[in-house]
Amino acid sequence: MASNKEIFQRYIDEFWNQDRLDVADELHTDDHVYHDPNLPELPRGPEGVKERGRIYKAALPGRVTAIHDWVVNGEKTLCFWTYEGVNSGPLGELPATGKNVAVPGMHLCHYRDGRIAESWVMWDRLGFFEQLNLATIG
């Protein structure tokens, strides 16, 4: 059986970096809960995970996520990552900007029976929109 760290690494490698959204069915529980303040209305389970993937894939096709550091504690993993890409598609109602972005974030997962049961994600949303020239401070 794969370790929790290996499961999450596979989620990054296959789901995010290879755009294999179908892998969510294998890696997430049927009642998976995704806590993302940017997308609070996602359905539970792998379908919600795939919907999140479709949204970001449309806005940042070809983006790459790299994990920089880990904390593994029993049934939980926490990782610090950065994703990079070009905003070449719409993000909700916002049009594509053609701008490059590099955005840091953290992802905390709780595992049950060898699958991701709950996820919390926080990323630098303000920095993301500043890089797209869609937000300013001051």
Describe these PLM feature segments:
Residues 1-138:
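C-terminal and inter-domain tail/linker signature
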